[in-house]
A protein has these predicted regions:
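Conserved "ABC signature" C-loop
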Residues: 1-24, 123-128
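A short, proline-enriched helix->beta-strand linker immediately N-terminal to the Walker B motif
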Residues: 47-51, 80
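Catalytic Walker B motif of ABC-type/P-loop ATPase nucleotide-binding domains
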Residues: 53-56
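Helical segment within the ABC ATPase nucleotide-binding domain
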Residues: 67-79
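Conserved catalytic loops of ABC-family nucleotide-binding domains
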Residues: 76-85, 93
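ABC ATPase "signature
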Residues: 110-111
């Protein structure tokens, strides 16, 4: 549990609290910030070391420091672990190998990150009509 809490950045905000990990968080995490709630959710996902992690905007409410910590942790996944990341943040693309771009429910680009990003820059990817 401590490994998951450390990896997700939960201990970064609980270590300064006298209650530590026993701190009250309120119903639905109401006493936590949005970024703290995301850190707790990520810690729960890390707990079982699942072979596939599906994360939808996992750092959307985090500050830059917390996001960098999570990016570093996700970049450390083992080759046997797969991350499926849904994001609008281009900074999160640093940790992926493959990019799939979707628009209106259709795939408009799919391939190695460098190829897809290059195609997007050159206007080779067309929007769905």
């Amino acid at each position: 549990m401590m490994d998951a809490a450390n990896r997700a950045g939960v201990t970064a905000f609980t270590q300064s609290d006298p209650a530590g990990l026993e701190r009250q968080v309120g119903e639905g995490g109401a006493m936590l910030s949005g970024g703290q709630r995301q850190a707790v959710t990520i810690a729960r996902a890390f707990l079982g070391r699942p072979p596939v992690l599906l994360m939808d905007e996992p750092t959307s409410a985090m500050d830059n420091r917390s996001e960098m910590h999570i990016k570093h942790q996700l970049a450390q996944l083992k080759p046997s672990e797969t991350l499926i990341l849904i994001t609008h943040k281009t900074s999160m693309l640093d940790i992926v190998d493959r990019v799939i771009v979707m628009e209106k429910g259709s795939v408009i680009a799919d391939g190695p990150k460098s190829q897809v990003l290059n195609d997007l820059k050159q206007g080779k990817v067309r929007a769905v009509s």
